[in-house]
Amino acid sequence: MVLVLAWTPGCGEEDENKPEPGASAGSGGSGQAGNGGSGQAGSGGLSGGLQPFTTPADPGNGGILVTVSGEDLAINGYPFISGTSKSEGDPPAFVDGWEVKFNHFLVTIGSVTLHDNPDKNPDDPKDMGALVAEATGPFAVDLSIGGPIVGKSGSPDEKTVAIAAFTGPASGGKFQTDQRYAISYTTVAATAQARNVNLDAEGLVLYQQAIAKGWVMALQGKATYKGKPPKAGSVFEKMPREVTFTLGFANPASYLNCQNTDLTPVGDEEFPRGVQVSAGDKTIAQITWHSDHIFWNKLNVEGTPLHFDPIAAAASTYGSKDAPPGVTTMEDLDALDFLAFKTRDGEPLPWRSEVEDFTPPEGTLAFDGNGVTFPKNSFGHFLRYSATSGGHFNANGECEVVLNFTP
């Protein structure tokens, strides 16, 4: 599947939808959302310099509850079992033999909107009908923690957290059960005005770093090499077997008029766009984040192989056999050329495979920008763009993605 991300020139990182002090997270009236109602505190009273958050009350039959999920992969990570794991397995494996786990996976959601008529313009799905309701954050969410609601996969390992609830249109009354409403959301730079949905004390420390650096997404985790012993004298032998990493991306974007995999496909669309409520129950609308997109080796193509070697080869302790655990930062990755990867010591980094369903090319490891150009061939820029494509709806629904930053 080919993905298309649109860049909107002139769109900055400033959030134009910040709530005024004391404002609700919704748009008023029966479309009120987010902190409205009689829900429970979402972060156990821990704000850590952010704004407090109250879990939205159940919107009831005919209402919409908005949740956020990083699926089970943001919570459990990516295991690697030598001789068993596959690039196209479930879950997919890093082809170079690394097990990757996240301690924190932070995303700041700016707003969630509902519009009339998701099918208004089939040639341009970004063109929707009138605004019906809006929940305005920002909401700071840790996808590696999740919440008490089982996600769209049905797996108990997919733990999602609610950020907003719509009981009906902002103008009053109830949603119509015989029509679909276009659903969209935005991501924005981390800010002290964000409501702390579920960040713990350690996550709040990382979030402060995200605020300082203008990051929308911030990840911390650890990778452990689980593949076969590397060849003696190779650059792979000089990599630490354990790498702690911090990744952050200043990549605000709009995810517009999303497809809904809960609905039956019709016509030329893979899935219909929008949400449709039920008179007999609430409807779950799940913002879904796919963490694998960050580690793809080709932009704008679904499901390309995952690699960690470029990050490991940039680690602080790279350079000797049996190197101790190392650390990799975004500054390390910004300095790398993704068209010809090198190690921290400047040696060419070859391709390799530790799985049976990926055959590595000859020569130096190089990623494919697939027509996307950057001011320089920085791996940091590549990662930022690729991470942006991870936003979906209801598991695998595609959205019209508009980049509110310069690639």
What are these regions (language model features)?
Residues 7-54:
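Ser/Thr-rich, Pro/Gly/Ala-heavy low-complexity intrinsically disordered linkers and tails
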